[in-house]
Amino acid sequence: MGARCLALLLLYGTLLLLLLLPQLPLAGAATRYYTFNVKLQNVTRLCNTRAIPTVNGKFPGPKIVTREGDRVVVKVVNNIKDNITIHWHGVRQMRTGWSDGPAYVTQCPIQTGQSYVYNFTINGQRGTLFWHAHVSWLRSTLYGPIIILPKAGLPLPFTEPHKDVPIIFGEWFNADPEAIVAQALQTGGGPNVSDAYTINGLPGPLYNCSSKDTFRLKVQPGKMYLLRLINAALNDELFFSVANHTLTVVDVDASYVKPFDTDVVLITPGQTTNVLLRAKPTAEAAGATHLMMARPYATGRPGTYDNTTVAAVLEYAPPGHIKSLPLLRPSLPALNDTAFAAGFAAKLRSLACPDYPSNVPRRVDKPFFFAVGLGTTPCPGSNNQTCQGPTNTTKFTASINNVSFDMPTTALLQAHYTGQSAGVYTADFPASPLEPFNYTGTPPNNTNVSNGTRVVVLPYNASVEVVLQDTSILGAESHPLHLHGFDFFVVGQGTGNYDPSKHPAEFNLVDPVQRNTVGVPAGGWVAIRFFADNPGVWFMHCHLEVHTTWGLKMAWVVNDGPLPEQKLMPPPSDLPMC
């Protein structure tokens, strides 16, 4: 009897260990602890001072530095009046969906005076990601970099840099962004655009009252630098370039790519791009001041984006006297240069080598066709006079397959885990538009959308293909779509309407780029594939915050697999309540 009990105890211990494996750091890995105190801080930009939400009083927020395989533990304490969550953008969160962060999807928000501990392990990723708030528009100031170094002893698959530098793009609003979005939702119109772009929180010399608020990157002649580009802007894709310097792209969304040279990088909100920059020899460098500049790639209608340019300075050591040196500005593409956007995306290829294989699904279990774009919804009958949407009787909205997603008041993951989804969500999100139309042609007469909290349920480890098709209902426009909980492979893209009888034969199943956020081309389509190997509930949404606000979002429910290590971990004891 005693031997039998011991055997059962050992079996129980083995099963428990298997359950905990994703939470345990690998041998030689570390556990890295952080505390994020969310609090208001007075910050002045453009000669305008505003009390903004920050982490630990810093803007941008502190960086997290970790290695592949490490566990990261972050205690977030909310000291502001708004509810808060933090999303670890791009982190796979294998079986740890409770730490993903989107409000009312994987957790209820952290209320004022409360705290929550995010606990996750970095699995199979190295490069640059970032963290940001995931409630309303609070991420306009609550963001910071996540630096993922390779496992100790593993070399980089490109030239070792002398130094690496985060370059975070953001948007500055003189007004409170929460008031801006509240007004837009009340009127049904588009929100006011930002007053400036920022690089590492600073607007730079091209804006009024901002020459002293300029980021300066000091470099040594001849040295190699790794720039970790992060687009944390709310609503704008950006072109970026450094005057008189070539950039070598080596990593996107914490996945290595085949290196290629470019003068300009296109980066959408939610994307990261690591580029190498070799500083020029002394004789060349001393003769000029080099600007680093970014401005929007804008395919929407005029007035819907901030049409300004942000600049920083690349400064050689020893620095020259700026007033006496010629000022070199980079050449940036036209605002709506869709050809450059398509060409840049086509250059991105994964390494697809033995050390970093490209495990793209070659067969598809679950195909989906998602038509994405803007639409309308009628104004309330008694408030027609306040409507400022496409017409005076409609409001702007956005949808996937004509479903504008309604956020629940209970976290979807909690409802799924407890088996109490009734009244929270329905598992009937359409796999394709119920009423197909010429997506990039003449818009249909009826532009109204439906509403609902509808999800797709996937069996564990299903191979999934999603074709994301832009629509011209209210004008063709690029949409950066972000998928939580997974990296996906971008197997194809094109202009016009997707043709299922023609385009799959052109898919790249050898070395497609792997990422977590992809730009759906304006007036075109993009195809992605991934394995549903991460149980939980995973948000998918446009990373233009205004479009997410209007409903361009949905959720995937991935069921548990049969084995212990294929099941969602239990919720932590401090999970916030709604």
UniProtKB/Swiss-Prot annotation:
Residues that bind Cu cation 3, according to the entry? H134, H484, H541
Its taxonomic path starts at: Eukaryota, Viridiplantae, Streptophyta, Embryophyta, Tracheophyta
Q: What class of enzyme is it?
A: oxidoreductase
Q: Which UniProt keywords apply?
A: Apoplast, Copper, Glycoprotein, Lignin degradation, Metal-binding, Oxidoreductase, Repeat, Secreted, Signal
What cellular component GO annotations does this protein have?
A: apoplast
* GO biological process per UniProt: lignin catabolic process
Q: What is this protein called?
A: Laccase-10
Residues with attached carbohydrate? 42, 83, 119, 192, 208, 244, 307, 336, 384, 392, 402, 438, 445, 448, 451, 461
Free-text remark on how the cofactor is bound: Binds 4 Cu cations per monomer.
**Could you tell me what this protein does?**
Lignin degradation and detoxification of lignin-derived products.
Q: In the Enzyme Commission scheme, what number(s) does this protein have?
A: 1.10.3.2
Q: Where does Cu cation 2 bind?
A: H89, H132, H543
Q: Which family does it belong to?
A: Belongs to the multicopper oxidase family.
- One matching Pfam family: Cu-oxidase
Q: Which residues bind Cu cation 1?
A: H87, H482
Please write the reaction equations for the catalytic activity of this protein: 4 hydroquinone + O2 = 4 benzosemiquinone + 2 H2O
- Cofactor(s) in the UniProt record: Cu cation
User: Which residues are involved in binding Cu cation 4?
Assistant: H479, C542, H547
Main location group: secreted
The record's listing under Gene3D superfamilies reads: Cupredoxins - blue copper proteins
Span of domain Plastocyanin-like: 37-153, 163-319, 428-562
Signal sequence coordinates: 1-29
The record ties this protein, via PANTHER family, to: LACCASE-10, MULTI-COPPER OXIDASE
Q: Where in the cell is it found?
A: Secreted, Extracellular space, Apoplast
- Which top-level group of life is the source organism from? Eukaryota
In Gene Ontology terms, what is one molecular function of this protein?
oxidoreductase activity
